[in-house]
Amino acid sequence: MNDLNLRVAALKVCAHPKRFAELRDALVPLPNTWIAAPHDFVLQFAAAKSSAEQVQVVKDVFYGEQAQDHEDVAHFLADLLLASPLKHAVRNQLTKLFSDNALAKQNASPHRRHSKEHLLEALQQSLGEMANSLAVITPPVSHERTNDVFVSANACLQNFPFGREALGKQVHRFAPLLTTALERYWADICDPTLELSPTRRNELYLYVQNALRFLVSLLAEWSDKLRLFEDQRFPGTSNAVAQKVARYYDTPWDVRSIAALLIGHLARFSGTFKAYVEDCSRPKAEQDVPIQMAALLVLRPVDYTENATLALAILKRIVAVSELKSTVTNLLVFLSKHLFIYSKSLGEMHAHLPDDQKLLYQRILAQLQVFALQNISSDTDSVRHMSSALLHQVLQHAQAAGQEELFQVVYRQFEDRAAYLNASCMALEQLVAVAGVSKSIENCPSLFGVIFPRHLGCEDCVDALFKAMMVSAHKTEPFAEWQSRWFGLLLAAIRVPEKRRQVIEELIAQAVQLEPTRLAQVLLPDDRLPLSCKLAAILGVRQLSARRQNLLRGMKEEVEQALIGLDDHTRLLALRFLVETPRPSELLNADQMGAIELYVRHNANNPSAHLRQLGYGLLQKALKRVHFGLVEYRKSRTPASQEVLQFLIRLIRTLAQNLFPTANYGRRWLSLRLLRDCLELSEMVGITFSELGIELPTEALMACLGDSYEHNKVLAAQLLERFQSHSLFKPDEMIELLLSLRPSDSATGAFQLQVYCKASRVQSEMPTPTHGGTIHEPLTFRALQWCLQHLREGLRLAQLDLGEAAKLNPLYGLLFASRHLLQQLKLKELAKEPQWRQYIDELVTMCLAVSSVVLPVVSSASPEGHLPETCDQETDQPLTNVLDRQLSREELLQVRTTPQMILLCAWRSSKEVCLILGELVQRAPLEEEEDEEQQQQQGDFLLSRAQLEAIGEHFLQLLAETKHRGAFEQAYVGFTMLCRRFWHSESVRLNQLPGQWVDEAMAMVSGQEEWAGKGARLCATRRSAGMPFMLQALVGTELKLGTHATLYRCMNRLLEVCERRTGGAAGITARSHALNIMRALFRSSELAELVTEFMARGIQCALDGLLLAEEWAERNSATLLLAALIVRVFGVERARLETGELHVRNRMTGRIFFTRYPQLFDYFHAALQRESEQMDAGGGGSENASGKRRQAVQLEAMLLMLSRLYPSSLEGAESTLNLSEFVPFLIRICHSHDLMTREMAALVVANFVTQEQALAEIRRIVVELKALQLRLKNTEAANTKLNTNVLHGQLLLLLHLHRLVRWTRPSLTRMQLHTLAELAAPLLQHDACAFSALVAVMVAAMEDAVEPGLLDFQLLEQIGVVYLLNHKEVQSRCQQLGISNRFYQIFGLHLHRLRGISQGIVLHIVEDLAETIWALDELKVELWLYILLQRSLSEQNSLVSEQDIEHFEFSRDIRRYFETLSREQREEVGQELYESPAVRSSVLHMMHMIKSSKNSCWSLQLAGRLAALQTLLRDPGLELNQLVQRCSEEHSTHQEAGLLLGLRRLIGESKMLERKHWLPMLNYAQRLVHPGQPVYLRHQAAELCDSLARNHLRDQLVAGTTDVDIGLVGRFSGLVLLLLHDDAEWVRHRAVQLVCGAGLRTRSGAGQEQEQSAMAPLILPSALIPPFLDTMIGKLTFDDFNMVQRLVDIIAEPFTTADAMELFDKQENNHYCERNHVLTELWDARGRADPRARTPTIPTGYQIFK
């Protein structure tokens, strides 16, 4: 609400909201009459430095005892109040002081106290002086000053009693001034010679609005006083101006409404009110609606005695206009708002009407109800909400007056389906809120007969109505009846699969909240309800929390099943049910602890980050309850607390086991965090490892230090530091990692070194001498010295041969380790020891030396290809990817040095140097910040003044000269740390350095002569390289101080550089740098909204750069800046809708856009006007081709921004900055010579116009096209010259406008089709491009002609003439321009569809499209395949699914054509295609041509679609042997879908599959499930396995089979394991359905036999794998143990090969599969199958934690 008030207040003073907010915080200037005043209180106020100080001065002046000039204080404060901006703190304080409360608080002596009379006199005097200041005639006072006076005076009426009283005494001064001001404002608005810009005209309208509002307020408050005013010009002139304002079409609706109110008040003031109301009741034009609406609003209750009939007549006129203009959104917004205000005034009207006029009251309410019901489901939010409130108000009045007829109207509308379901439900919801539920149920039997059973859980409006009625009925109905009617309906709805379960669950939870105890008894025992429904109800009702323990016992099996079920929502609900409790101190019981263990065991590897975070949050709640149990255990070892301790031990062991090698990221992430929490919990309570009886999983945590994610490394290192006393790491192994070329190895070595340094005991000592003088962290000091020693060696080698150093000692690993260890230390403590100070000094020197060595590489013009001289350049050594694995020194010596190796060494070394220096400056004690006495005595600092200067210059050099992005990005990070320290430094010199650097950078960028030498060092390419980052660091770090001076200084300077347009190469370079820097600043998230005020100028600079730039570098920079600004304005690009439209989050209303950036309206308006004038003049004539292209590029960019805007529902309500202002220019721009410009302009026009404007424009275009058709008909087509650009633009515009209006005006659309059909033939002779656009318009109209009767036979015959044109000519002309003739055949498809003869449709699809002349195999095959897929999808036990249709990516025109077919046509056409011999022959012929063709004219997509199409025919001509043979052949991935469909069809049709086919098909499926294959193919492999398992392999997979094919069972089991560990969730879920549906899962208990016939519950793969393996291994009868071992080896084969180890262990293509875990499960299953088997030898790491 504060934002709304701010916006309204800002509009009152005609200021931008953000600028107005700044005005509120700015200092209030002294009034002009007090500037030279010598009074003390004036001087005190003038000396204030902030608005807060000014407020305090004002209070002191008011309450203090002034020794002199006491009489002037009140006058000064009154002048100051009226001079202060609205909502300013000073004005607010003064308003409080000029009140009775403030007078009562005075403590001054009686003769110096302020009195009410004195304050009122001061206010009255100040108001009089303000009025007199406007009475000056020559020179006239500016409009701005006049508006400020009126706004300030009008504010006296807002919660300011003293101001209201004082203004009442000066009302005679302001009335004539307001009349004069209105005349002046309106004269300027109507004067065409002034050529007002749109924004200036909008400001004048706002001034008019303020003056009108003030005048209405004066008339409403002091009409009696104004009657004493002798100037008769006041009412007459004001009324004349108000009449013009209210009727003028360009006036915003808010201004028109206030002008109309003024007319009504003036009519009452002048005594002509009766004539005024009579005049408004007569038929009027549309522009008189505001005046008629105001006539109703100014009516008083007593006026209805004489004017009730007239009021009804006026209301009827208004409702009639709303029906006629139902598509004009801003009119409906205006009417709905004011009719609702009017309805609120009708409460007292009924009492003043005589009995014979009571019927008029009912008719008035009926008219209001008509409007409300018509618009209650409007697409516009404000209209919909206002109409709902209006209906509610009307029904309340009707109930009070006993008018039952209005209720019956709502009932009849609902029952008769007279309106849309949405409108009927919303109306009935308002009725229920007024009259209750019982009558609605009685009068609307379809509620429970049709609406609720069919639409509950499917339609939002029905859900809202049901909720309102259920809650209302609970207050009146007996519980039994209420439960049976409402709750029973919800229980029935939750069982329907098509319903939205979450919505029904929310309604059930709402019902349970109403009756928690009794409904729980009904809800919980019902086994037919899903568990999620029960849990949602229990968790949503606090009263049931106390019974949660009992509920858990009753639902234990259900909850445990839910914890491992496939439904994510239910899993989280079950976990919430276990861990959440009203009393956090309540201990976990055995059931809860067991269920939590079950959840952790099977959900730890969940790859979803969202679910992982939610689950971790809930488990933390469980650990809090564990904490209370451990505290109780320490106090008194109760059985319950001992169970909690044992649970913690089991949980820690489980988490430790989860850290096995190849565990996926999700398992490691969750396990490390929970393990840390558990260990910290035990440490907090004081329970040791020995007491827990466990050991720290040292080896697992040490392995986690090699994790590819750094935060996992950090957690593992913290756990090892904290709980491990003895380090097992060896220095030789660590230094080998630090010298590795692989950055991941160096990071692992650094973390190992961190753990090594923190250990109290180490297994291997560091090979460096002990420094006895160091007290602080001696082991870390030795480690750093050790790294420094190797750094010296590496630096010496790099100085001699950088290529050899890049292989043998790449430096960055040692630098990273040094930085990492320094991060663990407190640098202030190090400054106290000389050894540490010496080390830091050496490290800084070393870093600068390393940077100087690698700088030539990263600053090279081409860092990626830079190769300095090295000793192995002339050798024939082979190239090797050295990052695949860790290589030894001997192996590295045999590797050839490559530029990539050198660049990796250079930029990562530069990165570590920058980060080390930046962190040292940020954290270390500095010499310049030490006091002089401290420097003389101790010198406790780590960085000297000289080192700081060297570091600063080093960063500036890197950011100015570096070309490699990785290097200067990290230099930016380090430089940011330095700038942050300097900005906050207490040292004056350091604090001034960033400002000096900014000035120097700005001087270099702007190309000043004295900085020309340094400016030449800047990178002119690569988006200015590091220069934008330098400015971003300097500007962004200053924000922490709370000041933005540097930002404003930089932005203004950069914008000036771009706007200055200096010529020459220096000017071009300067503008390029400025554009690139602004791009970085606009993209910076730190600056956020601070850059908003510069965005309009930035957009102008970018667009001007596109037009005026002479070099590609500047145009490129301008394009990048514009792209960044579009993202900043409209948000990050989101996925487009299926129709190709932008996401709504990437669009904005024109009202919001131009409220934020008002100056852009004038810029766009002028630019579009200029371009449109050039279109009319013939395109600029003298401009060269390059200039035309730049102009087109700028115009396209402008249209790209405008295409993201759309009209607001309040368009024209409060502003004249309407998008419709651009439409005339855009229509002319549609005639541009550039195709893209024409298309964009047509799209923008369709976005900007209303439906009425679109219809008018369509009429105009159709008339022009008809004239063109007649002209072409009367003259020879060949001799007629056409401007094809204009014609093509008109057709594009017609296409987009038709998509807006559709068939809302059938007669106009028919005329449009007739005209286009007549024009098609002559247009084909002139231009095939325009002909294609014409046919596209016809296709769009024909697509929408779904309802019968829209097109008659005669019109279809006229349209059919277009398809009778010479097809060869159409094809040849399209080929000449490179246009596909697909559009023409789509036209033919719709033409035959509209004729309504199914056989004709089939003949056209089968025969016409098969003509060789068209060569439209792509279209034909796509259409056939889509129809047959849809036919197969509608069958029972369908071969295809929605995923198959999505896979083939059918075009929109094919999908749209199929949607337009009726259901009968779809079935008939699909069946004809399915049985057609011609289709089969054509398909087989094309497939033969593809196989025999040696050229590449056949696309892979066509081949894949043909393969799928063949399988869907009645007689596909496929043989299983051929398909099985193709399974083993190499072919395109596009053909896999067809091959799989064919296999599944033949497998399903054959009763028995030959044994020779089993293994080839399993091998083929295994090839498809490779993680590198598309997800669709992997899913299809699961479908294939399901078909095999259900139909043909069942005899091999059942228990007790003796003749078992080990290879078959093993291959199938391994394949299913791969599917269960697939990376895609829907593939894993399909595999779960396969296992459970085929009976391949063993379950113990009585239900084992039952499960063979019914589908088993679907559970997570991790929980399903053990029973699956038990089925595949344990239930098969083997006499020989070696057979079991062989089966296990075959199952494990996909996970044990070298390729599998490479694939799964890296976790690149598959992030879910955990190879070691799979093998461990497999070996465990083998052990369960044959307990006699000895424990197998498993490779190292497979069973570390078993």
From Swiss-Prot:
GO terms for molecular function: calcium channel inhibitor activity. Pfam families: DUF2428 (PF10350), TPR_Trm732 (PF25150), TPR_Trm732_C (PF25151). GO terms for biological process: adaptive thermogenesis; negative regulation of endoplasmic reticulum calcium ion concentration; negative regulation of lipid storage; tRNA methylation; tRNA nucleoside ribose methylation. This is tRNA (32-2'-O)-methyltransferase regulator THADA. Together with methyltransferase Trm7-32, methylates the 2'-O-ribose of nucleotides at position 32 of the anticodon loop of substrate tRNAs. Plays a key role in energy homeostasis by regulating the balance between energy storage and heat production. Functions by negatively regulating Ca(2+) signaling pathways that are involved in heat production and maintaining correct lipid storage in the fat body. Regulates Ca(2+) signaling pathways by reducing the activity of the calcium-transporting ATPase SERCA possibly by promoting uncoupling of SERCA ATP hydrolysis from calcium pumping. Disruption phenotype: Flies are hypersensitive to the cold, hyperphagic and display elevated triglyceride stores resulting in an increased resistance to starvation. Heat production is impaired and flies are slow to recover after cold treatment. The size of the lipid droplets in larval fat bodies are significantly increased and flies display increased feeding. Total body glycogen is also significantly increased in adult females but not in males. Mutants also display an increase in calcium-dependent SERCA activity. No effect on levels of circulating sugars, glucose and trehalose. InterPro entries: ARM-type_fold, THADA-like_TPR, THADA-like_TPR_C, THADA/TRM732_DUF2428, tRNA_methyltransferase_THADA. Detected in the larval fat body, salivary glands and wing imaginal disks (at protein level). The keyword Disulfide bond does not apply. GO terms for cellular component: cytoplasmic side of endoplasmic reticulum membrane. The gene is THADA.
